[in-house]
Swiss-Prot record:
Core subunit of the mitochondrial membrane respiratory chain NADH dehydrogenase (Complex I) which catalyzes electron transfer from NADH through the respiratory chain, using ubiquinone as an electron acceptor. Part of the enzyme membrane arm which is embedded in the lipid bilayer and involved in proton translocation. It comes from Rhyncholestes raphanurus (Chilean shrew opossum). The gene is MT-ND4L. One of its GO terms (cellular component) is respiratory chain complex I. Its EC number is 7.1.1.2. GO terms for biological process: ATP synthesis coupled electron transport. The chain crosses the membrane at residues 1-21, 26-46, 59-79. This is NADH-ubiquinone oxidoreductase chain 4L.
């Protein structure tokens, strides 16, 4: 394995550990999730270009679209939570009832 792949796997692992460690605030959890999605996007794009699998060339873009949707929903939830409760603690999410 080359050092680029190892660095990307390390970045994914660090972002995953960030989700597990900094799970008290919603904003820090969303940032760690975005780091995970970015490392997955780069890893997928490099793997597809390295193995010349051009039939799968749309897969990184689809992952990027899902990442953008996840970020939009997460930020909307962050705004709703902070307007309703005045903080961005993950424990406040249980209080959101429609």
């Amino acid at each position: 394995m080359t050092t680029i792949y190892l660095n990307l796997i390390l970045a994914f692992t660090l972002a995953l550990s960030g989700v597990l460690i900094y799970r008290s605030h919603l904003l820090s959890t969303l940032l760690c999730l975005e780091g995970m999605m970015l490392s997955l996007f780069i890893l997928m794009a490099l793997t597809i270009s390295h193995f010349h699998m051009f039939s799968l060339s749309m897969a990184p873009l689809i992952l990027l679209v899902f990442s953008a949707c996840e970020a939009g929903v997460g930020l909307a939830l962050l705004v709703k939570t902070s307007n309703a409760h005045g903080n961005d603690h993950v424990q406040s999410l249980n209080l959101l009832q429609c």
